[in-house]
Amino acid sequence: MQPSFWHDKWDAQQVGFHLSAVNPLLVKYWPQLELDANAQVFVPLCGKSLDMCFLAEQGHEVLGCELNELAVQQFYRENELAFDISTLAEHQRFHTEQVTIYQGDIFSLDAAEMPNTQAFYDRAALIAWPEEMRSAYARQLAKLVPANSTGLLITLDYPQAELNGPPFAVSDDWVQANLATDFEIERLSSEDVLSENPRFVNKQVSWLTESVYKLIRKG
């Protein structure tokens, strides 16, 4: 999957992955991370997600990373947030009070550029990668977040042969096999959500499960 895939999606505004409200699973499970209100939270592949606004409203400093510049511009514009732009290594840095977004490739982001991160939130990043690229993303996430940082991960799982991603199917077995080296893993919930997702119903996908995990970066 090339960067042009996502740029084309944003250019055409084919952004069905963008939610028009804060993710209810974030609202429900974020308190279980028991973070300090002022903890810095990293949001990989953040798009223009309203979840960043929710995190900022909890008192957190939010640090996102997003490949597409239009998505970043739309986040600030649609939320009526004034911002300034600077350059940091290979990324453009968009900044307003409490929300900073590095625009560019997450694989060229360096942990030195986000030294104060204490937590992370992944709703749409892990499931955005096809299986052949997913492990590389997981390794990069582990490099970026420091030891003992706590995260919330949301995944979808379904029979991949029945529908082309993204979002791609990520099973509990995959999570355990590929993240356990770097993270302590606790599954907080796993629910059947097929009836709530018309795209999957219309494509006659036989089942769809959404899971929530609490992750802690190992030392």
Curated annotation (Swiss-Prot):
Gene Ontology cellular component terms for the protein in this record: cytoplasm
The EC number of this protein is 2.1.1.67
GO process annotations (BP):
methylation; response to metal ion
What does the record give as the reaction this protein catalyses?
S-adenosyl-L-methionine + a thiopurine = S-adenosyl-L-homocysteine + a thiopurine S-methylether
| Compartments (UniProt record) | Cytoplasm
User: Which Gene3D superfamilies does this one have?
Assistant: Vaccinia Virus protein VP39 (3.40.50.150)
What is the superkingdom listed in this entry's lineage?
Bacteria
Report the SUPFAM superfamilies cross-referenced here.
Answer: S-adenosyl-L-methionine-dependent methyltransferases
Q: Which Pfam families does UniProt cross-reference here?
A: TPMT
Residues annotated to bind S-adenosyl-L-methionine: W10, L45, E66, R123
Q: Name one GO molecular function term.
A: thiopurine S-methyltransferase activity
Give the record's keywords alphabetically: Cytoplasm, Methyltransferase, S-adenosyl-L-methionine, Transferase
What is the predominant subcellular site recorded for this chain?
Answer: cytoplasm
Tell me which family the UniProt entry assigns to this protein: Belongs to the class I-like SAM-binding methyltransferase superfamily. TPMT family.
NCBIfam families the record matches: PRK13255.1, TMPT_Se_Te
Q: Which HAMAP family match?
A: Thiopur_methtran
Query: What is this protein identified as?
Result: Thiopurine S-methyltransferase
> Organism source for this protein?
Shewanella pealeana (strain ATCC 700345 / ANG-SQ1)
Q: Species lineage, top-down?
A: Bacteria, Pseudomonadati, Pseudomonadota, Gammaproteobacteria, Alteromonadales
User: Gene behind this chain?
Assistant: tpm
